[in-house]
Amino acid sequence: MNMLNEARKEEVLELAKVLISQQSYSGHEGGVAAELEKYMKANGFDDVTVDKYGNIIGKIKGNRPGKKALFDGHIDTVPVANPAAWVHDPFKGEVVDGKLYGRGTSDMKGAVASFTAAANFFAKDTARDFPGEIYVAGVVHEECFEGVAARSVSEIVKPDYVVIGEASLCNLKIGQRGRAEIVVETFGVPAHSANPEKGVNAVYSMCKVVEAIRSLKPVEHPVLGKGILELTDIKSTPYPGASVVPSYCRATYDRRLLVGETKESVLAPIQALLDDLMAKDPAIKAKVSFAVGEEKCYTGNTIQGERFFPGWLFDENDAFVQDILTELHAIGQTPEVTQYSFCTNGSHYAGEAGIKTVGMGPSRENLAHTDNEYIEIEQLAKVCQSYYAIMKALLK
């Protein structure tokens, strides 16, 4: 049976349009959450919850006990930096030549619309005669904090399986590198720049630190690749200098995380390097830590956390992955089994909580955050069928 007739395709498209029409930069996702709540309640979801951060969670309960499958998608987007660069209004949801245009179409309101509708269709077609529970979650603040708001979702749901809806061109993702933001600080002694010998220049100390860090060899994983450590910015204090020897300097590094790496194992080689530098040159004073982020949620609450988001990887031969592939093959889909090249909420579900997790989403990864972002309507329909098949695979 083809579960996605023309009326249902239109329903998915209309829901995606409605979500796109709601501007939802990080911390301002309330409008999208309200639209999802409206759709869920209109279609008989058993429960709709909005947590302290503003995550919205819909639940459909099967008639028999069983596993819990959670479909996760973030509902925040990056800002539109230059509206004049857009041919189509980023918040109108215009359809042109088989493409739906707008901020968040590919990243990732199209996926959220598709799996929310798929849950509705699955419940109706089965008359809820399935074991277990389906949850769909619209998660906030992912663009700032991959996985931090998702912690609240998994505490509420306690899922057995998670499906991340991030863009994959409808291929199946079974892992990703994680990400950490590492801060290295050097501390000097201020002095007038006319008499620099009376102070200690924190920037010169940082130059030595940066050069030493460049000598570190990245760890490597046979599937996920290198645990890259890349310098992304340096700032000194005071700035502007105004004839003052800088007494403080801060460098930020982007570190890509591999499976099994911990906060301690990631910082240890940098700390050892700093200890060696400080032992050789008493003028150098330095420390290393993870960046801490704090953001305001649309609910008024604050979300906060260290910027450390673990990597994760499952085996293609794991039973739950094979079950999913079997159902996808049954509807004529033959996805590649690969890994995401970017960080997702899977950092929490799989990396921190150890929950069986896969990713599948519509559209291309490289359309995220672009001017004139779009999603092909054919991809919306295809992934809706995929999510329906995955529900069948996990809830049996």
Locations of regions flagged by a protein language model:
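Acidic/histidine-rich catalytic neighborhood of metal-dependent amide-processing enzymes
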Residues: M108-Q176, E181, L395
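Residue-level signal for inorganic ion chemistry
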Residues: L19, Q23, E166, M206, ...
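Metal-dependent amide/peptide-bond hydrolase catalytic core
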Residues: V183-K396
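Glycine/serine-rich anion-binding loops at beta->alpha junctions
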Residues: G98-S114, H192
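Secretory-pathway/membrane protein signature
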Residues: M1, E6-E14, V18, A42-G44, ...
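Acidic/His- and Gly-rich active-site-bordering loop/insert found
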Residues: M1-Y101, K124-F130, R364
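Hydrophobic/aromatic beta-strand patches that form the interior of the parallel beta-sheet core
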Residues: A69-F71, A137, Y161-V163, P282, ...
